[in-house]
Amino acid sequence: MSENYIQMIGQDKIYPIIRCKEASQTIEIAKALVEGGIRVLEINVENPSIYEAIQEVSKFANVCAGGIITSMQADAALECGAKLFSSPIFQMNMVKISKNKQVPFIAGASTANEAYNAW
């Protein structure tokens, strides 16, 4: 992990999450965010076409693939160039993927039990 993406997010004080159904719209929004100085942005994986956007945007930005809940999604996003990934829920298998591939993972928690297990 040569870059500290989590530190960049903290320094930028903003973490944009792009949720679009169309890859082209996602790419245009990402370009505008980067032109505005954003260093890390999240692209939520709404559907399979969004991997195309991750692949394109990762050429000019640090992309976090968001909404990842399966190992197949994580692998696909990382293969497309995502530098980190996030999930709306806590799953230990996502932590294992993060450690094995040496990429940051931002875990969400929807319940007290999920938060406790993540701790």
Residue ranges and their predicted role:
Residues 1-81, 100:
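Conserved N-terminal beta1-alpha1 strand-loop-helix module at the mouth
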Residues 49, 69-73, 78-119:
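Conserved anion-binding
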